[in-house]
């Protein structure tokens, strides 16, 4: 039987936030958003930044967990030698998140269990390229036009794969700008209005049979 996939979240077509142009002589600003829990896999992000071994990198971490989880993540950053590259923002308001996205070069989304995360659609709204796993509801969207994906494997290989992609993007910011342009051109396909029209169209086609 044929199946129809329509992701369960949409983008805000009225948003005025737009991502900045990436420049090679500026810090490589990466934003990570989520809870400090197993699903979100912040340790993979921290270890990937460590493995890419580039000096002019900033990892902006938006989100939090219980005291033990926060202390553990900060301790991991120190042990990995990237504490100075990590900026811990805690819980951030929606408007501030959009502003931070607009001033970032890349969203690093390390979640391994998710539907179509709202922050992925918000990044697309802003035109912020995404680096993530090719899994769950968000993977196919990112792989299609919104960024770069790596295959879900094991923690060690994931860190190596992400670090490889991060290094390539760090060295060639024009790739990020090209992805951003493509995102803004195609994002209308993911608005709530477009999804509603698509759903109605398919219902009408079914009723005609």
Label each residue range with its predicted role.
Residues 112:
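Aromatic "clamp/platform" in nucleotide-sugar-dependent glycosyltransferases that forms part
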Residues 1-18, 25:
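Donor nucleotide-sugar binding/catalytic pocket of nucleotide-sugar-dependent glycosyltransferases
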């Amino acid at each position: 039987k044929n199946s129809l996939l329509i992701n369960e979240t949409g983008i805000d077509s009225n948003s005025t936030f737009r991502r900045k142009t990436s420049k090679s002589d500026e810090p490589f600003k990466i934003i990570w958003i989520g809870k400090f829990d197993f699903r979100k896999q912040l340790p993979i992000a921290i270890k990937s930044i460590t493995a890419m071994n580039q000096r002019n990198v900033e990892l902006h971490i938006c989100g939090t967990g219980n005291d033990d989880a926060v202390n553990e993540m900060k301790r991991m950053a120190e042990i990995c030698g990237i504490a100075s590259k990590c900026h811990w923002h805690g819980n951030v308001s929606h408007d501030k998140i959009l502003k931070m996205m607009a001033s970032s070069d890349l969203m690093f989304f390390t979640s391994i269990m998710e539907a179509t995360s709202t922050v992925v659609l918000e990044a697309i709204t802003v035109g912020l390229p995404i680096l993530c796993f090719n899994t769950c509801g968000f993977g196919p969207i990112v792989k299609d036009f919104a960024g770069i994906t790596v295959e879900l494997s094991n923690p060690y290989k994931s860190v190596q794969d992400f670090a490889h992609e991060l290094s390539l993007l760090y060295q060639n910011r024009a790739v990020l700008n090209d992805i951003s342009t493509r995102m803004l051109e195609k994002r209308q396909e993911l608005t709530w209005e477009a999804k509603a029209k698509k759903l109605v169209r398919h219902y009408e086609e079914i009723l005609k049979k």
